[in-house]
A protein has these predicted regions:
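Conserved catalytic core of nucleotide polymerization and phosphodiester-bond processing enzymes
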Residues: 1-277
């Protein structure tokens, strides 16, 4: 059964600004969305800034609204972090002190509010380090298995599929890296990674496994899959009552055998041409 609850993005905003989820507007929900997307994979102020720019969020205005709602212990920690950042000439990304403090406080509140996820980042990074150092030994982290064989670090996903990282290394400081395509230069180069980034990799991969795993059943039911976009299936079907968005959503939200208990839901609409809802 699908577990019911508040909209995740509204809940994130409501917690940060001390209001009820029901009172969160559509525009303010975007701030909650930025919080979840930026902070869910060990991101900090820099990640918050990146996602805020993508979603058109004014961090200075947000800082003015939120500064008085922050718990004092959290704000004290953020003030200490800001002092350390300035002392060590670390970037503040052109933000005012108030905006920086609010972003950092949101980060801290999110991590305190999601201890299982925060510990997952650390545990996954430690398992990856150990696997790189000790080839041929399998390490487990939650539902994942990590092992290095030869020039490959592999993470076995709950579905049985593998994520593969070529030429994994640890530097003198114990930082992880592997070879891959640089997203900016598009050149083959050494890429740094960490617990939060690895968590993002496995989360996105598992999500893809859910989406792709239900595609055969969707096509068997008579829906022709034209393409998929992120978490969407775009299909064509005959213009008959039995083919409808609710039926397709039910097929997409079928829980795979390897993910028992995973709450899934889907929604959709019918249209003559592809568009965003």
């Amino acid at each position: 059964p699908i577990r019911k609850g508040h909209d995740l993005y509204k809940l994130a905003y409501a917690k940060s600004f001390g209001i009820k989820p029901e009172a969160v507007s559509k525009d303010n929900r975007q701030i909650g969305k930025v919080q979840e997307l930026a902070l869910g994979y060990e991101g900090g102020v820099g990640a918050f800034l990146t996602f805020a720019a993508a979603y058109g969020i004014d961090l200075e205005a947000m800082g003015e609204q939120a500064i008085d709602t922050l718990p004092q212990p959290i704000l004290n920690e953020a003030n200490s972090a800001l002092a350390w950042t300035k002392l060590n000439n670390r970037p503040t990304f052109g933000l005012s002190d108030r905006a920086w403090l609010v972003c950092d406080s949101f980060k801290r509140s999110w991590r305190y509010g999601h201890p299982a996820i925060s510990s997952f980042w650390k545990d996954l990074e430690e398992a990856a380090r150990l696997a790189v150092m000790r080839p041929g030994v399998t390490y487990e982290c939650r539902m994942l298995k990590l092992r290095r064989d030869g020039a490959w670090l592999r993470i076995r996903l709950p579905s049985g599929r593998f994520l593969c990282y070529p030429s994994p290394q640890l530097d003198d400081a114990g930082k992880l890296s592997y070879m891959g395509v640089n997203q900016y230069s598009r050149k083959w180069s050494r890429l740094k990674t960490y617990g939060g980034k690895l968590a993002e990799n496995v989360t996105q991969a598992a999500s893809r496994d859910v989406l792709a795993g239900n595609m055969p059943a969707i096509e068997a039911a008579g829906y022709q899959i034209v393409l998929s976009v992120h978490d969407e299936n775009i299909t064509e079907a005959e213009d008959r009552d039995e083919f409808n968005a609710d039926h397709l959503a039910g097929l997409m939200a079928t829980t795979p055998t390897w993910a028992k208990g995973l709450p899934l839901a889907a929604a959709g609409f019918e249209t003559r041409r592809y568009r965003k809802e």
